[in-house]
């Protein structure tokens, strides 16, 4: 389970709530990983990937609009970070899902959660400091 911590708070309610939603989506993957009742998790994995990509695109757009509104000087490089995340999610090799579904979920979650945590604590923190 991935727990939201106070250290992830930026103090901007809209963005903090969107970041929490990204954690909620990641937790769906964690719950699926721990669920032993599904023999075939393929469709559920795909649902999570699609939801993650769509919500991340929404959030990144919202965050970039906010950064533009405050005249954030590093907006372009911040956007590149967002773009690299979306490209990585798009590059998840869905052909590998059936080889070992739990391993696939774990690797996907490792990337997603690490990226989100590091991005919030390092890159996002820059625009509030």
Curated annotation (Swiss-Prot):
Family according to the record: Belongs to the hemerythrin family.
GO molecular function: iron ion binding; oxygen carrier activity
Subunit record text: Monomer.
Keyword annotations of the record: Iron, Metal-binding, Oxygen transport, Transport
PROSITE patterns attached to this UniProt entry: HEMERYTHRINS (PS00550)
Source organism: Clostridium acetobutylicum (strain ATCC 824 / DSM 792 / JCM 1419 / IAM 19013 / LMG 5710 / NBRC 13948 / NRRL B-527 / VKM B-1787 / 2291 / W)
Protein name from the UniProt record: Bacteriohemerythrin
Annotated Fe cation 2 binding sites: 63, 78, 82, 119, 124
Binding site for Fe cation 1: 19, 59, 63, 124
UniProt keyword Metal-binding present: yes
Ranges in coiled-coil conformation: none
Function text: Oxygen-binding protein. May be involved in a storage mechanism or for delivery to oxygen-requiring enzymes. The oxygen-binding site contains two iron atoms.
HAMAP family noted in UniProt: Hemerythrin (MF_00556)
Database matches in InterPro entries: Bacteriohemerythrin-like, Haemerythrin_Fe_BS, Hemerythrin, Hemerythrin-like, Hemerythrin-like_sf, Hemerythrin_metal-bd
């Amino acid at each position: 389970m991935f727990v939201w911590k106070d250290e992830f708070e930026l103090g901007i309610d809209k963005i903090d709530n969107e970041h929490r939603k990204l954690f909620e989506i990641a937790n769906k993957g964690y719950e699926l990983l721990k669920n032993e009742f599904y023999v075939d998790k393929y469709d559920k994995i795909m649902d999570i990937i699609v939801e993650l990509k769509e919500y991340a695109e929404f959030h990144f757009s919202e965050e970039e609009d906010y950064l533009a509104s405050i005249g954030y000087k590093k907006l372009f490089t911040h956007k590149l970070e967002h773009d690299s995340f979306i490209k990585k999610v798009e590059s998840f090799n869905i052909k590998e899902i059936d080889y070992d579904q739990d391993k696939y979920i774990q690797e996907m979650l490792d990337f997603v959660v690490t990226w989100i945590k590091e991005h919030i604590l390092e890159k996002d923190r820059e625009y509030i400091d």
